[in-house]
Design a protein with these regions (language model features):
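Glycine-rich loop-to-alpha-helix module at the N-terminal edge of alpha/beta enzyme cores
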Residues: 57-59, 73-81
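PLP-dependent class I/II
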Residues: 2-5, 10-11, 23-26, 31, ...
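Conserved helicase/translocase P-loop NTPase motor core
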Residues: 70-71, 100
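Short beta-strand to alpha-helix junction loop
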Residues: 65-66
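Intrinsically disordered, tyrosine-centered linear signaling motifs in cytosolic regions
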Residues: 60-61, 201
C-alpha cells in the first residue's frame, strides 16, 4: 500500500536544467552550454581559509544565523553598495536556494499568491507551490523582458503576498530598468505586498547605471527581502553559501524557518565567506564580457534574435522561426549536433532557449560552431 504524501509536490517536476544536462551526459563529447556555473576555480585566497579553519578544528555548531563577525562583514559589504542593514538583519544561508526557501516558508500562508515575472528560474514556482501557495505568472516578453505596470497590476488580487524579481535575470541576462523598478515599487506599496529580490547576479553587470530595487527604493525597506549568493561572483557554487537581508521584524520570522530547515550554514566556511567579500570579481567579469560579445556576434550571424543581456552570463535567443518547441529544439540539438542548451519552457517562456557562456573559451567556440551548423539545417 502506498501511503499519501504532500499533495502540493505532486505537480512539481525535477529541474529541467538538470534533466537536459543528464541527457547531454549520455552523449560523449557533448558541449554543454546549459548549466549556470562559472568555469573558474574558487580563488585560492578564499579556499585557504577553509584549510586554516579545519586545521584549527573549526568543525562545531556555529550560531544559527552565522557568526557575528561574518554578519558584520556582510552588513558593511551591503552598506558599501548603498543598502543599509545591520548585522542583526542578515542571515548566512546554505546558498541562495535555502534563503529563498526560508523566506517563502516564513512569508506564505496556504492560498497566498506570489507574482513571478517570466521568464524566471523554475525554483521560484517550486518553492511557492511547496508552501501551499499559488504562483501567478507575469509574461514580460511583450515588454522586451521589462515589467509593464498595467500588466503587473492585472496580476494583483486580494491574495497576493509578494512579487519576486531577479535582475540581472536568469535566463535572459536583462536588467530591470528604472521604469520597471518604479512600477514594482508603486504596485508593492499600494497593494501592501513584499518584494523578494533575487540579486545573486548583481556583481555581474556589463553596463553603466545599474540599480538594484532596494537601492532605488529604500522607502520600501520594511517590505523588501534581499537574497544574495557567493556562488556566481566568486565561483563558489559547490560551497552552498548565500545570505539574505530584511528589516528586523521580517528577519526574525525568516530566522525561525532557517533554523528548522538547516540549523546553520557550515562552520568552517564562514571565514572563507568573509574573505570572499574582499576579493574583486572583476577579472572573471571581464572574461564573461568578452564571451558575451562573442556569443552575441555568433547569434547574429546565425540569424537568431536576442534581447542583448546586460548582466549574468546567459543569452536567451528566440527559436520561433524554426517551428519547434524549445524542448524539441534542445533535444534535437543534443542528438544531432552534440550541443546542449536549456529549453525556454523551463523558465515559463516558450520559443526561446537559454545559452550559458560561463564555459571555457574552447568549449564556447566549439559549441557555437555546432549550434550554427545545426540551425543551418532547420
Amino acid at each position: 500500500m502506498r501511503l499519501p504524501m504532500n499533495t502540493s509536490l505532486a505537480t512539481l517536476k525535477p529541474s529541467g536544467i538538470r534533466r537536459i544536462n543528464a541527457l547531454a551526459a549520455q552523449h560523449p563529447g557533448c558541449i554543454a552550454l546549459a548549466l549556470g556555473e562559472p568555469d573558474f576555480p574558487t580563488p585560492d585566497v578564499i579556499s585557504a581559509e577553509v584549510t586554516a579553519a579545519l586545521d584549527r578544528g573549526d568543525t562545531h555548531y556555529p550560531p544559527n544565523n552565522g557568526r557575528p563577525a561574518l554578519r558584520d562583514a556582510l552588513s558593511k559589504y551591503m552598506d558599501d553598495a548603498g543598502l543599509a542593514f545591520s548585522a542583526d538583519e542578515v542571515i548566512l544561508t546554505d546558498g541562495a536556494t535555502e534563503a529563498l526557501s526560508a523566506t517563502f516558508m516564513a512569508m506564505l500562508n496556504p492560498g497566498d499568491e506570489v507574482i513571478i515575472p517570466t521568464p524566471a528560474f523554475g525554483l521560484y514556482e517550486s518553492i511557492v507551490v511547496a508552501n501551499h501557495a499559488k504562483a501567478v505568472f507575469l509574461d514580460t516578453e511583450p515588454a522586451q523582458f521589462q515589467i509593464d505596470e498595467d500588466a503587473l497590476r492585472a496580476c494583483v488580487t486580494p491574495a497576493t503576498k509578494a512579487i519576486v524579481i531577479c535582475s540581472p535575470n536568469n535566463p535572459t541576462g536583462c536588467i530591470l530598468n528604472a521604469a520597471s523598478l518604479d512600477a514594482v515599487a508603486r504596485v508593492a506599496e499600494q497593494a501592501g505586498i513584499y518584494v523578494v529580490c533575487d540579486d545573486v547576479y548583481n556583481r555581474l553587470v556589463y553596463v553603466d547605471g545599474y540599480e538594484r530595487f532596494a537601492q532605488r527604493h529604500p522607502e520600501l525597506r520594511e517590505q523588501t527581502v534581499i537574497i544574495e549568493s557567493f556562488s556566481k561572483p566568486w565561483s563558489m557554487t559547490g560551497w552552498r553559501l548565500g545570505w539574505l537581508a530584511a528589516a528586523a521584524p521580517v528577519i526574525a520570522e525568516i530566522a525561525k524557518a532557517h533554523q528548522y530547515l538547516v540549523s546553520s550554514a557550515v562552520s568552517f566556511e564562514m571565514d572563507a565567506a568573509a574573505r570572499a567579500l574582499t576579493v574583486d570579481p572583476t577579472p572573471m567579469l571581464e572574461v564573461y564580457r568578452t564571451r558575451r560579445e562573442h556569443v552575441l556576434a555568433a547569434l547574429d550571424a546565425m540569424g537568431l534574435d536576442v534581447v542583448e543581456p546586460a548582466g549574468a552570463f546567459y543569452t536567451f535567443p528566440s527559436i520561433k522561426q524554426f517551428g519547434l518547441t524549445s524542448e524539441d529544439f534542445c533535444i534535437k540539438a543534443i542528438k544531432e549536433a552534440n550541443v546542449a542548451l536549456v529549453p525556454g519552457d523551463c523558465f515559463g517562456t516558450e520559443g526561446h532557449v537559454r545559452l550559458s557562456y560561463c564555459v571555457s573559451d574552447k568549449d564556447l567556440d566549439e559549441g557555437l560552431t555546432r549550434l550554427s551548423n545545426f540551425v543551418s539545417t532547420l
